[in-house]
Amino acid sequence: MGRSKKSRKPGALGAPEPMVTRNRSESDVEGRERKRVKKRKGLKSGSRHSDGSEAKQRKAALARDPRLGSKKKIPLIVEPAKKLTKQERKLSNEQELEMLENDAQLNTLLDRIENGENLGAGLQKFVDEKLDRIEHLMGRLGLLEPEDDEEEIFEEAPVASKKKASSDEDLLSQFEDFDLDSFKG
């Protein structure tokens, strides 16, 4: 029977360590392997020459412009920008009005004004501009309700302004559709 040797590997505490039995040929193979590994410790020969070229290659790879060789397709024909129709402009006005009505900052400032606080000049100007814009958008969309007192005094004026408002929209659409390139010499 061969020699039996205890293993040095830590096991469970108090548990008996198993006995490791090895053949003579296994021990020889392990010994040769350890000797080969021990011989090959250290750096490879000629490393000071080969490391420089690898570092240069790495620097070259990093310095290369990533935009070179792009596969992104570029359109050769530029399509003219599509002009918004009246209906699309009206839709965008509705969206802008909704955004202004749901503006949290404007709502808090209006609440402060209702509570009797005096706002600074800048904040008051901001509130006035936003309220004017809301009133303008409501007028363009036809959501603005005329006041009764002013309607009795000036009966003819709102009728004329309504016609003017519709003609203003017509003039605006006519201006946007007008091609200025035809006047270039």
UniProtKB/Swiss-Prot annotation:
Quaternary data: Interacts with Der.
UniProt keyword list: GTPase activation, Ribosome biogenesis
InterPro entries for this protein: YihI
Role summary: A GTPase-activating protein (GAP) that modifies Der/EngA GTPase function. May play a role in ribosome biogenesis.
GO biological process: ribosome biogenesis
Name of the molecule in the record: Der GTPase-activating protein YihI
Feature: compositional bias, Basic residues: 34-47
Pfam families associated with the record: YihI
Region (Disordered): 1-74, 145-169
Organism name: Vibrio atlanticus (strain LGP32) (Vibrio splendidus (strain Mel32))
Signal peptide interval: none
Family: Belongs to the YihI family.
Entry GO MF terms: GTPase activator activity
Residue stretches of biased makeup (Basic and acidic residues): 23-33, 48-68
Amino acid composition bias (Acidic residues), ranges on this chain: 145-155
